Swiss-Prot record:
One of its GO terms (molecular function) is protein kinase binding. This is Cyclin-Y-like protein 1. Residues 181-263 form the Cyclin N-terminal domain. Its main location: membrane. The gene is ccnyl1. One of its GO terms (cellular component) is plasma membrane. It comes from Danio rerio. Belongs to the cyclin family. Cyclin Y subfamily. Pfam families: Cyclin_N (PF00134). It comes from the Eukaryota. GO terms for biological process: nervous system development; regulation of canonical Wnt signaling pathway.
Length: 339
């Protein structure tokens, strides 16, 4: 998952910039310039972001910033624990499996190969907490389901006042991932793009726009991160009643609001993966554990050897490239003198 894709900002695009960017521009404008008469070239140290700005950075861009969905879920987690403590609710039979000397329980989900079903459950739960604990109802017309319906069925009048249940969000996302044959990594990147959109455009995901925002994030993540490219017309065949023109328009607005920043560093991806696992533990959505058998141990060993061989090959290629860069530096060997 070390691959990163970046894109330049369109000169004609005019997405709404967040407050952090305005403060960053003020900081750069106040940078001292040398009194030399020659042309001034800004040093890389002059472009470093101050600590107070780095701490307020968007979590979808910087690994040190905490994810938004995890902080929004903590309120419900604390209330649930407090209610159980006051009402003396017993946890009942412990369903969590623990390893012992004779048996080791492991799940089949890793940061590089997450479990698809469990990951989609966690991602949709994060979206559920985003909707439930939203600050307001800031939205745009392009994401309004009443103005741009996804089906021919009439949208209820109270659609903007009823929060969707977790099962409804999971069913919607699961249908798209199953039909388009998307991977679990794509689900994590979908959540990254979703939180980046909410931060950059200063929006809230709410009952009136959650389907189109999630669809736009999945559409973009599948094109950037999935090995098999999914076209907009493919989603039109899945949703049946949506038009290609509507999909193209929504994708264009989504990219503009992201300021064409589709880069997801490996550290940010890993942070979202482990925060999703924490969210699963807090909500009793633990990943399925199975005892370690000889067959699974051999499979893990084979995967480890495959990764090890791949990294060895990459290091050899990098070493050969460095030696053959300009034919000036090579490996020098000296004869040993034995006495």
């Amino acid at each position: 998952m070390g691959n990163t894709v970046s894109c330049c900002v369109s000169p004609s695009g005019s997405p709404k910039l967040p407050r952090q960017v305005e403060r960053l521009e003020d900081y750069q404008n106040n940078t001292d310039i040398s009194d030399d008469t020659g042309p001034y070239l800004q040093h890389i140290s002059d472009r470093e972001v101050p600590d107070d700005l780095a701490l307020e950075s968007n979590p979808s861009d910087h690994a040190r910033a905490s994810t938004i969905f995890l902080s929004k879920s903590q309120t419900d987690v604390r209330d649930r624990r407090k209610s159980n403590h006051i009402n003396h609710v017993s946890p009942g039979l412990l369903s969590k499996k623990y390893s012992s000397c004779s048996t080791i329980f492991i799940d089949d989900s890793t940061v590089s190969q997450p479990n698809l079903k469990s990951t989609i459950k966690c991602v949709t739960l994060a979206i559920y907490y985003h909707i439930k604990n939203r600050d307001s109802d800031r939205s745009l017309d392009i994401f309004d389901e009443k103005m741009h319906p996804l089906s021919r069925e009439q949208v209820p009048d109270d659609y903007s006042r009823t929060d969707p249940e977790h099962k409804l969000i999971y069913r919607f996302v699961r249908t798209l991932f199953s039909a388009a044959q998307l991977t679990a990594e794509c689900a994590i990147v979908t959540l990254v793009y979703l939180e980046r959109l909410l931060t950059y455009a200063e929006l809230d995901i709410c009952p009136s726009n959650w389907k189109r925002i999630v669809l736009g994030a999945i559409l973009l993540a599948s094109k950037v991160w999935d090995d098999q490219a999914v076209w907009n017309v493919d989603y039109c065949q899945i949703l049946k009643d949506i038009t290609v023109e509507d999909m193209n328009e929504m994708e264009r607005h989504f990219l503009e609001l992201l300021q064409f920043n589709i880069n997801v560093p490996a550290s940010v991806y890993a942070k979202y993966y482990f925060d999703l696992r924490s969210l699963a533990d807090d909500n009793n959505l633990s990943f399925p554990l199975e005892p370690l058998s000889n067959e699974r141990a051999q499979k893990l060993e084979a995967i480890s050897r495959l990764c090890e061989d791949k990294y060895k090959d990459l290091s050899r290629v990098a070493m050969r490239r460095s030696f053959s860069a300009d034919n000036l530096v090579g490996i020098r060997r000296s004869n040993a003198v034995l006495s």
